[in-house]
């Protein structure tokens, strides 16, 4: 009987030890431009996490930020989301109730471990002499930008353009609306994501200027044909804060909460902040940011909270069905 009891206890101990050292796979639903970033962060985090005796794999799903939010709402079992803007995670919280509405308060800097901004990528020599936002609406200038209804960069682009026009001498909401309407008349195709627009501009050869994430523009310069492009920083842009969050319901269902929370906290560590900077995202760590000051120049930045009343208001006003973008965008005209 004692031998049977010992075998049972040994089996139970082995089972528990196996469970404790079980492989963990996290699914990260992210936006298109972060492919390279999260591949590197996933590898780095896995090596760090392995020291605890567990093996972890980060699997990422990428697409337009708005489309990714809808996928999670519709059932994509993401443990974490790393999206382009807070409104998309707010939608997951309000529509699917997969995480609490106060999710932004759970991590530093409103749950945004890095920032970016919107810049212009032009062709070598800047043949159209594009230097600022007002140059984008000159006759003959073709602008490449993603679709604000599906992507994340696209909504930052739209708001940066709006803020520029509204803050111009004599500017107001009406002049900003007219400027943005004129701007989108110069956009021949609206890709579903910022990465899609990068491909349209650099691989398909369409357009005179690409409006996109700073990190996408810097990445383009590092490609084999990077010498065919140059970055133009406009006179002012916008502070883009891509947030991250635990998807509580999914993580609890899959038993991955501990690993998922550890991963999100890891994004704020010096090791991860360095990786983020090397991948052309502006780190929150000021010492690390200072090391990359030549990569990330200072420029005046609008903010969603100060200039648009926060993401809930901006989303409802500009990007919801029937909002300002739907009112002003007239494809083919």
Give the positions of each predicted feature:
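Positively charged n-region of N-terminal signal peptides that target proteins for export
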Residues: 1-4
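Bacterial N-terminal signal peptides
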Residues: 6-16
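N-terminal segment of the mature folded domain
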Residues: 22-150, 329-330
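Short beta-strand->loop
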Residues: 29-31, 122-124, 142-169, 183-187, ...
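A bilobed periplasmic-binding-protein/Venus flytrap-type ligand-binding module shared by bacterial periplasmic
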Residues: 117-126, 241-258, 275-279
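Short helix-loop capping/hinge motifs at secondary-structure junctions, enriched
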Residues: 125-131, 150, 163-171, 250-258
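Ligand-binding pocket segment of bilobal, Venus flytrap-like solute-binding proteins
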Residues: 168-235
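Extracellular/periplasmic juxtamembrane helices and adjacent flexible linkers that interface
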Residues: 251-333
